[in-house]
Amino acid sequence: MDLRQFLLCLSLCTAFALSKPTEKKDRVHHEPQLSDKVHNDAQNFDYDHDAFLGAEEAKSFDQLTPEESKERLGKIVSKIDDDKDGFVTVDELKGWIKFAQKRWIHEDVERQWKGHDLNEDGLVSWEEYKNATYGYVLDDPDPDDGFNYKQMMVRDERRFKMADKDGDLIATKEEFTAFPHPDEYDYMKDIVVQETMEDIDKNADGFIDLEEYIGDMYSHDGNADEPEWVKTEREQFVEFRDKNRDGRMDKEETKDWILPSDYDHAEAEARHLVYESDQNKDGKLTKEEIVDKYDLFVGSQATDFGEALVRHDEF
């Protein structure tokens, strides 16, 4: 992979994703993804395993026997029981799931931090980020890959300034975390909406009309019939996205679309796990109830919890 391809992959712009003609592009910023598996307990519990431990931890489950799995699951249960009353509530389980899913964000930031804190002072300035990310590429006035790196840099600078709360163009680790992961921070959500509208609003009138909305997620392939999901999206735009029925989405309507706040996946999964494991139906789980359903939480194979336990000590 050459430098320009690498930069493209790492670009913090939300729009640069290519779609096949009949493949739907999803602009919605969901809660941190619990799993890319299908949630179908009738087939397997893969989704639940990913949600409970995080996808990366779940990958290493093949190594342990069921007995080892139960033993180490019991140790994790002790950590989930935040108030140490011997029970795991929906709220405690929800907090654990959110922690497990957000851990990858912090790991991603740690990886990026090492490459951008050039003077190793525990801060990342805009100049450091710019030099580390773009460097001499900006000296090429005519890149042959079709990407405008100067335009990408301007957009990155705007987002960096938004993440940098005190406006000194020097980011702490917390501020830097908001830079590549803006949808995790309420104060960054306006920039997410702005960038999305810039990507889709082809006529630059400050709104997203129906054709721009469809054109962003679907590229018509010659004489092929329009897929059914495209027709559904047209109906969604008219019936739900365009709330004031003026034929276009403004900033607030776009925000409601891409940053929905009416569904909490972590809470839904926590309630599901409690419902499936709560043998006496008292609305909370004992360690025994969880371990008895270890196949739901961690499967018949288990994970290398040694690393998980170390990582979760701070929880």
From Swiss-Prot:
Signal peptide: 1-19
Residues that bear Phosphoserine: S69, S261, S277
Binding sites annotated in the UniProt record for Ca(2+) 5: D242, N244, D246, R248, E253
Binding-site residues for Ca(2+) 1, renumbered to this chain: D81, D83, D85, E92
Residues annotated for Ca(2+) 6 binding in this entry: D278, N280, D282, K284, E289
Positions glycosylated per UniProt: N131
Keyword Metal-binding applies: yes
Cellular localisation: Endoplasmic reticulum membrane; Golgi apparatus; Secreted; Melanosome
PROSITE patterns reported in the protein's UniProt record: EF_HAND_1, EF_HAND_2
Residues the record lists as N6-acetyllysine modifications: K165
Alphabetized GO MF terms: calcium ion binding
A Pfam family: EF-hand_5
Binding-site residues, Ca(2+) 3: D164, D166, D168, E175
Residue stretches making up the EF-hand domain: 68-103, 104-139, 151-186, 188-223, 229-264, 265-300
Annotated positions binding Ca(2+) 4: D201, N203, D205, E212
Modified residues (Phosphotyrosine): Y47
Motif Prevents secretion from ER boundaries: 312-315
Keyword terms: Acetylation, Calcium, Endoplasmic reticulum, Glycoprotein, Golgi apparatus, Membrane, Metal-binding, Phosphoprotein, Repeat, Sarcoplasmic reticulum, Secreted, Signal
Role: Involved in regulation of vitamin K-dependent carboxylation of multiple N-terminal glutamate residues. Seems to inhibit gamma-carboxylase GGCX. Binds 7 calcium ions with a low affinity.
Family named by the database record: Belongs to the CREC family.
Quaternary organization: Interacts with GGCX.
Protein name: Calumenin
Name of the coding gene: CALU
